[in-house]
Every structure is written in C-alpha cells, then in structure tokens.
C-alpha cells in the first residue's frame, strides 16, 4: 500500500499581512480537503512570522500573530530571529502560551531558569496509517543578541548531531524545519543523510520546486507569504520505505481572501491603534524629516544615541525616519509609524583611520541613495549620515558629487592609530554596507531597546511644549 503524506508551510511573513487572508483561506481549504479524504496533513511555520514593523505585532508583542496562526489551524512552528531577538525576555517567554500548535526548536535555551512550557526539542507525529515522522527545528545563532536577552542558541551542527541518531532509530521519516538560511540548509543536507526533508527560511529564498541535495529535498517559500509551500511524501508500506519526495510552492496572491480572517485583521488593527494611541508629547510646531538633508530631529536623535550609549561619537542615517510629525499630540503609534524598524543601538570600536573611511563612504551617492530591505531596516533609502561629536566638512566636485575634505573633533583631526567608540544602528554591523564597522572586533549591542525608544526620549527632551 502507498500512502501520501502532506505538509503545507509558510516562512518569513514578517507581519506583512497583505496576503494573510489569502494564505489563511488556502491553508484551511487544503487541510479540510485532506481531512475529507482521510489523508495526513500538517501545517507548519518556519519562523519570523512576528515582526514588530507592523502596529498589530507592536501593540500585542506578537500575541496577535499567534492568534492568527491558531485561527488557521497550524500544527507546528519554530522560532525565527524576529521572534527571538526583538522581544523582551518575558514577552518571548510567554509568546506561545496560548498557541494551539507545537513549537519546536532544539537549539533554543533559557539561561535565566526553566525553559518555556511550550518549547520542544523534537516532536514525533504519526500518519493515519502509522508512519512515524520525526520533527526537529533549529534557529540562527545570533548569540551576541540572544545572550543580552537571557537566551542562548547552541551550535546548529552540534545540536543536530545530538538528536539525529535518536530520531533515526525511533522514526521512519525525519523533517527538519530550518531557520538557518539556504547555504546552511544545503551544507546540512550534505552532512546529514538521515534527513529526508528540509523546509527552510531566514534568507528569504524561493524554491518553486524542491532541490535535491544528498538524500534530502530542500524547499522554501520566499518572504511575506506571497507563496505557500507544499511537501508531498509517498510511503510504501509494503517495502517500509519512502519512495518519493516532492516539494512545490504556490503563488497565492491571486486567490480570494478569507473573510473571517479579514474581519479579524480589521479588529486587531483597530485595537492595536487604540493601544498605541498613548501620548508621548505635545509639539508646538511640526517636525520636518528629510532623507538627504541635515535636520534638527536627526541631529538631536544622534546626540541622544551618543549620550545614551556613553560613546565618543555617534552616527545615524536620516533614512531611519520615514515621515514628518505634525504639530500637536504625538503618540507612540506616530513614533512607531515613522520609525518602525527592529533596529537596536550598538557601539563599535574603530581606529581613527577606519572612522574616516566610514565617514567618506557615508557621503557617497551610492550609499545615500541605496535602497535597502533587510538587516532590520524597513525604510526606503539609507539617506544622509548625521554625526554627533564630530565636525565633518565637505565640498562639492564639478560633477555634483559631495566629498569629505576634513574630519575633526573639538577642532583637532582624529588620531589615525587611536581607537574610538562609535555609536550607530546595529544594521551597519551586518553585511557590507560599511565594511569597517562590520569587521570591527569590538561590538556592543543594546537590547531590548529599539532606536524608536531613543526617538521618544529625544522628542520628550527636546521638542515638548
């Protein structure tokens, strides 16, 4: 006898609810269809469902996301870095308390005491006809952030090696839910032939059809749930083995919306708006925001960052603030609207030479006009860099490009060999935006505060009537 086993999954929604009602309708319909046919079917989420960029996620600290997943009927989920490092310890500890699904993450640990009651290292599920399926999940080890919040992520390969033998002996099929990224998924498939399926996320890669690496089929559905993934396994009960593995992703952006989900989203948005309608200050004059010009609010915010982190200098890009603020009452919702990024303050150590190189790079047209999505940045462009504690003099070339002619502190040039503490946004410590910052061996992150918390302090201190 042949038995087909079905998994449907989502990954990296990032609280982008544009297509969520379509996702909900599609998944509920798929599950109902398989139940009618008496076929085994599970719904999975691979992490980063929560992202505090959206007011619903911000107001409810992720709890509304769990409600939405419950409504759809998810069976299993794992933790992404947006759940893991953008919530305070207590908020994450209780995030899944009301989940009607099992949460799996084998390398996630609480260093402040007992593990959350919802946390499972592995889970074993069973098909209608008795096929035992082992589920293991891992999340990306951003321990520089996790440890500041009271968590620890154990090394993925060591963790997998620890549990894989037990799963191999006790189950027929092993499914790995991975919030590690495509490169890690491929390497893990090469190293662990025991894995049958790797369902991925984190790096927002879209695999329209499954990719076979070693013994595993690898799949992932991009970002923001424009696609939903499906895995179909065929088990031969006579031969007692898996004879076929298929993986696909389906574009759901053209499907009809689930009206019940639409109503729930509307209710949550109204309630979130009410919760975020807490007055921060009253402003006598409107606040101007410009991405490519020096503004008072960006200068004051950069000054606050320098003072708050006790750094010698500070630098922030003007693109962090997305919109103006009107005169009158300013609420926390307004602050979230103009600074929605899950970006933390950080301090890096740079030599005088490295700092000057960073400053020169920041004034290039290429960086200022760079359209960026990722590293926590949820805006449009990087914009002009604003500095505190430094005087940066620039001139314009005949082609209109601006270049740095002089950098001083209290009228004196920087010592090229001296190390300085520079406060900035943590987004610059990732990737290649500003290589000198990313390469710095001394980085100190500040959590759970976001830059918008410092913006609120700045407004209270400098702009209140």
Q: Where does each model-flagged region fall?
A:
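Glycine- and acidic
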Residues: 8-11, 285-288, 436-437
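Structural signal for hydrophobic packing residues in well-ordered secondary-structure cores
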Residues: 27-34, 161-164, 168-171, 192, ...
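Feature captures C-terminal
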Residues: 17, 326-465
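Amphipathic, soluble alpha/beta structural segments
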Residues: 116-132, 151-154, 176-179, 183, ...
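A broadly conserved detector of short glycine/acidic/proline-rich loop/turn motifs that flank catalytic sites
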Residues: 137-140, 222-224, 237, 319, ...
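Residues in well-ordered beta-strands of folded domains
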Residues: 104, 219, 316, 393-395, ...
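A short C-terminal boundary segment appended to hydrolase-like catalytic domains
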Residues: 237-330, 462-464
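Acidic, metal/ion-coordinating pockets
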Residues: 1-250, 294-298, 304, 445, ...
């Amino acid at each position: 006898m042949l038995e087909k086993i079905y998994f449907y999954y989502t990954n990296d929604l990032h609280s982008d609810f544009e297509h969520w009602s379509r996702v909900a309708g599609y998944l509920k319909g798929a599950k109902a269809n398989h139940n009618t046919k008496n076929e085994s079917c599970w719904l999975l989420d691979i992490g980063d469902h929560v992202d505090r960029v959206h007011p619903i996620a911000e107001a409810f600290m992720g709890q509304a996301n769990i409600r939405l997943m419950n409504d759809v009927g998810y069976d299993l989920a794992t933790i992404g870095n947006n759940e893991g490092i953008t919530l305070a310890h207590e908020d994450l500890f209780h995030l899944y308390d009301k989940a009607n699904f099992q949460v799996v993450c084998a390398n996630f640990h609480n260093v402040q005491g007992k593990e959350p009651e919802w946390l499972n290292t592995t889970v074993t599920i069973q098909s209608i006809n008795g096929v035992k399926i082992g589920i293991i999940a891992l999340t990306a080890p951003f321990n520089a952030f996790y440890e500041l919040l009271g968590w620890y992520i154990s090394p993925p390969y060591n963790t997998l090696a620890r549990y894989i033998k037990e799963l191999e002996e006790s189950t027929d099929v092993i499914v790995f839910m991975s919030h590690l990224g495509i490169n890690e998924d491929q390497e893990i498939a090469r190293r662990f032939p025991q894995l049958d399926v790797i369902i991925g996320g984190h790096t927002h890669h879209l695999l329209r059809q499954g990719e076979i690496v070693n013994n595993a089929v690898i799949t992932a559905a991009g970002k923001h749930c424009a696609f939903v993934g499906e895995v179909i396994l065929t088990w031969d009960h006579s031969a007692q083995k898996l004879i076929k593995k298929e993986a696909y992703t389906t574009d759901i952006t053209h499907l009809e919306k689930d009206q019940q989900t639409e109503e729930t989203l509307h209710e949550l948005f109204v309630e979130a708006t009410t919760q975020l309608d807490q007055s921060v200050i009253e402003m006598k004059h409107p606040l101007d925001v410009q991405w490519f010009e020096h503004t008072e609010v960006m200068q004051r915010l950069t000054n606050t960052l320098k003072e708050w982190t006790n750094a010698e200098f500070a630098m922030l890009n003007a693109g962090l603030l997305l919109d103006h603020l009107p005169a009158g009452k300013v609420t926390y919702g307004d602050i979230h609207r103009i600074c929605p990024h899950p970006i933390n303050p950080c301090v890096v150590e740079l030599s005088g030479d490295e700092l000057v190189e960073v400053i020169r790079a920041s004034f290039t047209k290429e960086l200022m006009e760079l359209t960026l999505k990722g590293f926590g940045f949820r805006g449009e462009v990087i914009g002009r860099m604003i500095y505190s504690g430094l005087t940066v003099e620039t001139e314009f070339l005949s082609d209109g490009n601006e270049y740095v002619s002089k950098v001083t502190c209290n009228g004196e040039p920087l010592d090229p060999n001296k190390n300085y503490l520079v406060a900035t946004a943590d987004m610059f410590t990732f990737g290649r935006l500003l290589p000198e910052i990313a390469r710095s061996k001394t980085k100190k992150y500040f959590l759970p505060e976001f830059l918008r918390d410092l913006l609120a302090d700045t407004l209270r201190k400098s702009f209140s009537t």
